Amino acid sequence: MLYIIRQILQPLLAMIMSLNMMIFPVTEDRVPEEMDQVQNVIYLIGDGMGPLHLEKAKQERNISLVMETFEYSGRSMTRSQFNAVTDSAAGATALACGVRTINGYVGVFYYDPLCVESTPRNLTELCIEKGMMTGIVTTDKTSGATPSGFSVHTDSRNNTKDIDTQQMNSDIDLIWGATSSYISQETCEANGFTFVKTYSEMMALEEGGCSFAQFDNGTWYTEQYDDETPTLSQMTTKAIDLLDDTDEGFFLMVEGAHIDKNSHDNEDAGMTEAVEEFDNAVAVALEYAKNDGNTLIVVTADHETGGIVLNDDGTYSFTQGSHSGANVPLFVYGSDTFIENGEVVYNIDIPARIAYSLGFDKDDMPYERFADWVNVVVENVAK
């Protein structure tokens, strides 16, 4: 019976997919014809970080920001497939896979959330196929929306067990963040990962192995939460040290998740501290890139949270506890061709430009990976 249903549905789904591509055609080419080539990429995402988050942090903490010293800066537009305001899952999918999807979906096409026909390939997978080392570092739990966008394909950001399972079955060299429900030392080691729980265990890691970290939820502070919980900048430093171990280069995604989390609660002190520590991680990346000379740094956000506004008295304040549709910052170091100063780009263009900077063809990102049965149907139709 299942065989009969499969035979009926497969050609129908293939036809729907073809019609969809005609109704929603691929957008015009928005990747520059010439792109400076690099070996490594450090992609830093400040979750919920709008331009006024930066101004508020500078004002209230009396600091300057390393990211604002980058030679090139612009803005990114953040909408999802059907919403002017994206969530973190769709935002991560755009930044990782170069496609728009529905809020709540992670790493899937909006018209095929169960991956029946095809899935979009993310930057991490693309780099693994090239032989590069890859890593994901976050202050969120490892199954959070942003790290999930760079590591899994699922129809809901709340599918924690599915996300944890896909990550543990992946070929990513390191996945570090806060504790997620279904991750354990036994499951990690069974899948070839060294299980890491503390700062000292992280620092003891040596090149050549894979690691899965489950830290306490205090990694976003500017100072160590306790002796055994690293900060985001410390994680970034160690991750770069471990990934810089191959002639093929590396790809590292670093997320500062607590800019968003504190903005949802309109917590001024927490949000500004999270911005400062995220910028500390940017400083780590910049120091490495300056010494290396062959590394691209891209700093941006998935969306803005809190609707921060400038008041008449020159201060900044939150106006809401949810996401907004505001454009977000985009800073670039290590390429004279990635963006023009002041350029406004679609969020889905950023991973395409990253891929092109790494030497991939324009057709490689976004890339539609078809299920085996779709290829068979297409081949039969062609005959």
Regions of interest found by a model, annotated:
Residues Q39-N40, M132, E248-G249, G293-T295:
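Short coil/turn segments at beta-strand junctions that form active-site/ligand-binding loops
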Residues Y3-P25:
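Sec-dependent N-terminal signal peptides of Gram-positive bacterial secreted proteins and lipoproteins
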Residues V196-T236:
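Functional beta-strand-loop-alpha-helix junction segments that form "active/interaction loops"
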Residues A145-S151, G218-D226, T236-I240, D244-L286:
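Active-site His/acidic residue clusters
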Residues P51, E276-G314:
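Metal-dependent active-site segment of extracytoplasmic phospho-/sulfohydrolases and closely related
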Residues F24-S180, S184-M202, E206-C210, E304-K383:
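N-terminal catalytic scaffold of extracellular/periplasmic and nuclease hydrolases
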Residues G270-Y288, S317-V328, V332:
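Gly/Ser/Thr-rich active-site loops/lids in small-molecule metabolic enzymes
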Residues Y43, A213-F215, F251-E255, V298:
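Structural motif
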